[in-house]
Amino acid sequence: MTEKFGADLIVDSLINHKVDYVFGIPGAKIDRVFDTLEDKGPQLIVARHEQNAAFMAQGIGRITGEPGVVIATSGPGASNLATGLVTATAEGDPVLALAGQVKRADLLKRAHQSMDNAALFKPITKYSVEVQDGNTLSEIIANAYRHAKSGMPGASFISIPQDVVDSQVHVKAIKPLTDPQLGSSSVADINYLAQAIKNAVLPVLLLGNGASSAKVTASIRQLLEQVQLPVVETFQGAGIVSRELEEVTFFGRVGLFRNQPGDMLLKKSDLVIAIGYDPIEYEARNWNAEISARVIVIDVEPAEIDTYFQPERELIGDIANTLDLLLPAINGYQLPEGSREYLQVLRDKMDGDVKFDRSQTETGRLHPLDIVEVLQENTTDDMTVTVDVGTHYIWMARYFKSYEPRHLLFSNGMQTLGVALPWAISAALVRPNTKIISVSGDGGFLFSAQELETAVRLQLPIIHLIWNDGHYNMVEFQEEMKYGRSSGVDFGPVDFVKYAESFGAKGFRATSPAELTQLLQKALKENGPVIIDVPVDYKDSSTLGETILPDEFY
């Protein structure tokens, strides 16, 4: 009988869970797992930093709903995962992280790379354990995988001592059991909501990240086709409302901004139906400051209650099944005429929006709306657009339209710099037949820019736009609004065209809207990664900043 080691059990468990990709960087405490992956799969994607490998795993989780997998070695290899895992947990993305550890005999010693891995990750994951017996590896992986994707998804972490990885094992890898299937909410609760909608003057759907799965999106769209209720999306709920439904149901996104049509609608509504809503995206104190909103929740688990979020009823169960049963109970409902008139006024406000004088844009630089418009005109609904954090994120969240769920990706819980390129790599792997667009500032790009080598190595069809202004502008304009000056936000220039070329990617620079259009269309015909450096004029950031909620400055 062939000897089997802990590493075999780990890899067999990943195979049984139908994991396609593993992201990571090897090291002595975990290298037997990497050696085993070479023979058995899943496909190993070697990253250039563990944090970015965790972002890539998060991207898989965000897009597919199944945990992305990341593996790192002990010590700093493990600790470098922290930012990626806290981002995944905060933003509801399933991730399974494995990290090497010193041998069990050294766990309590001041030994090389020894630290309490499981304790480090416990506050920022849903499940954090350390394996002490190689024969339990598969059952622990099975439980970690299940924790990562159940309820509100997030990260699971497993610390594996080197001698556990190298130990002989005598059990087979567990094959995953059928996922528990939630039923709908109770019939009584569904009928309660149906009657509440019929009695309401202006019921509104608030759609969050938890409503963005393909199954739930399909149920929401089916409901909206029959009962045209007004809808507001959070940033991570972008794309739930289809292009066909936009004109009659969609009233914008909420997050960061005050006094936008979506905010006005939520305050005016006498019934807010929060579906898959997570307050980390847009805290209820921002849209329910008066503590007067009547709220009913549809979700997979009970809501977190606070002063500003006190739902009178919670419909807990499978969201799609609940919506499918709600539809026949409210079919035929129409908003009162007065509400329809109000919504038309609100739509006119959306069309008017904040006005900017683009004629004063600095020569050789583009106004943010020029960039957004060129992107909008040259992307299709099936393209994935990943967005980093920075001033560009504010403009993209407000003005860029998306019509498919989980195709416009934001970090809206942690607002983590550096996610765009790693997420683009994930998207390119799981959506191989489309171009991927990623967007960052010149500050955020260099948090993960080394992964351009990963994209080139894999020849992924990624077009990355860098909004280049030479500052951490999202901080800069907020400081200027607070203190009348800025500090700690300036840095030196980088030639991003040469930077791209040094990695083997194509590099371009666009200094006008026409040139950006030409270069973007050229980039769309390339096979591998392309960087487009776009000098941007952020003179209107302060104008846009005046519409940001004061307590949302970060």
Where are the language model's segments positioned?
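N-terminal alpha/beta PP-like core and its mobile active-site loop of ThDP/TPP-dependent enzymes
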Residues: M1-P336, F356, V374, N378-D381, ...
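Short, solvent-exposed loop/helix junctions and linker helices
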Residues: K4, G134, V187, E362-L369, ...
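Active-site diphosphate/adenylate-binding microenvironment
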Residues: I10-V11, A28, V33-E38, R347-P422, ...
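Phosphate/pyrophosphate-binding active-site segments
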Residues: N135, I291-Y393, P513-K522, E526-Y554
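Thiamine diphosphate
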Residues: L107-Q113, R243-E244, D306-Y308, E314-I316, ...
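Hydrophobic, well-ordered secondary-structure segments
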Residues: E281-A284, S292, L326-G332, S339-V354, ...
